């Protein structure tokens, strides 16, 4: 996300004045670039979590729908901005007023900063199988250093063959294929949302070499990582 020096300087100037500054969704990027989120808890849309975390190590990034940390406010975007607004109303005017506003808006489920953004794994994949969900969660949490199917199976009390059958039955693909798709999805996000080198993107997604990464990426997306980044940059410049 391109941000001009003028915008960054303006943000820093307003921050020095002690103003409360908030960013909705990807507006957390200019806030972080201006140093406004250093040492602060913050959030951003789940699609941008990986790239944001790679770029801003000094920010305590969470998966919450919104975060208030002192006079810094961030949201995941979408309807989470409504949740933040209702919290601000509740803080200043009480829960009754916030509930009345939500009722007027036909907003029946008010979330707090303890609520996470994404749907549960069973809801996302449309399958309610505890062990399958557990394995997918482990995969999602271990992209940089992938876990072998044998270890994944052992961790949920299954044999490798049983795990293979489970994935093919419910997801129509092998555990290895599903895991690879998760890693490539993260790689694609990093290529399009960060300035990380292709080599570093490969390492961040568990690939030992750029050549292997490029081969897998091309097989899945029908283009190379370098071309993906180039075409994305070209689209942004139009």
Q: What does each model-found stretch correspond to?
A:
Residues 112-177, 194-205:
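DNA-binding recognition helix and immediately preceding turn/loop
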Residues 64-106:
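Conserved anion/nucleotide-ligand pocket segment
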Residues 37-65, 100-101:
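A conserved active-site-flanking secondary-structure segment within enzyme catalytic domains
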Residues 43, 179-188, 227-238:
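Short, basic, alpha-helical segments at the C-terminal edge of helix-turn-helix-like DNA-binding modules
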Residues 193, 204-238:
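…primarily DNA-binding HTH/wHTH and HhH modules…
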Residues 165-166, 177, 189, 215-216, ...:
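DNA-binding alpha-helical recognition surfaces that contact promoter or target DNA
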Residues 1-20:
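Flexible gly/pro-rich beta->alpha loop and the following alpha-helix that scaffold active-site loops
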């Amino acid at each position: 996300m391109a941000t001009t020096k003028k915008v960054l300087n303006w943000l820093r100037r307003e921050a020095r004045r002690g103003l409360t500054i908030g960013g909705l969704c990807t507006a957390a990027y200019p806030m972080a670039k201006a140093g406004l989120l250093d040492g602060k808890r913050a959030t951003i849309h789940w699609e941008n979590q990986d790239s944001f975390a790679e770029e801003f190590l000094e920010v305590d990034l969470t998966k919450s729908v919104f975060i208030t940390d002192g006079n810094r406010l961030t949201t995941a975007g979408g309807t989470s901005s409504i949740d933040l607004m209702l919290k601000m109303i509740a803080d200043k005017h009480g829960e009754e007023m916030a509930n009345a506003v939500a009722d007027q808006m036909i907003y029946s489920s008010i979330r707090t900063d303890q609520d996470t953004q994404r749907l549960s794994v069973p809801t996302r994949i449309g399958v309610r199988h505890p062990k399958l969900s557990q394995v997918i969660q482990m995969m999602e949490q271990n992209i940089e250093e992938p876990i072998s199917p044998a270890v994944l199976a052992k961790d949920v009390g299954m044999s490798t063959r049983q795990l293979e059958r489970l994935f093919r039955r419910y997801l129509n693909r092998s555990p290895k294929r599903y895991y690879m798709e998760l890693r490539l999805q993260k790689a694609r996000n990093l290529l399009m949302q960060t300035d990380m080198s292709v080599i570093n993107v490969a390492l961040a997604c568990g690939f030992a070499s750029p050549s292997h990464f490029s081969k897998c990426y091309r097989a899945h997306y029908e283009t190379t990582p370098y071309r993906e980044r180039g075409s994305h940059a070209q689209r942004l410049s139009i």
